[in-house]
């Protein structure tokens, strides 16, 4: 089982190709809805004062590649992964951490472990 790329699959296949919901509804289900369910304040939305966690993509090409096995776990163990398609950047707390070519070299990653939820 591999859920790598689930959000990309939702955006590319279920929203763009199958049109089961609007792009706005799909993004809300991937961002705002989980933040609300788990009681994580100021996440999953774009508004003044909220954390600037952003994902830049092309709705015409967003998706994921076919799953493939890589052997990069300790002891040479395998895992399944997919590559993003149509993704141009990821920002965490307002700091860009990924571009269309992959993870960026930065001195300090801006994310934090969420240890407390309000749910």
Tell what function each PLM region has.
Residues 1-119:
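Active-site microenvironment of metallo-dependent hydrolases
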């Amino acid at each position: 089982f591999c859920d790598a790329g689930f959000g990309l699959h939702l955006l590319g296949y279920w929203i763009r190709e199958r049109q089961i919901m609007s792009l706005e509804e799909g993004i809300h289900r991937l961002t705002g809805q989980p933040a609300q369910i788990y009681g994580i304040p100021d996440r999953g939305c774009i508004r003044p004062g909220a954390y600037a966690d952003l994902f830049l993509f092309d709705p015409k090409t967003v998706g994921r590649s076919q799953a493939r096995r890589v052997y990069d776990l300790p002891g040479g163990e395998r895992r399944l992964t997919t590559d993003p398609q149509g993704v141009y950047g990821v920002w965490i707390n307002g700091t860009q951490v990924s571009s269309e070519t992959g993870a960026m070299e930065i001195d300090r990653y801006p994310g934090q472990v969420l240890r407390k939820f309000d749910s």
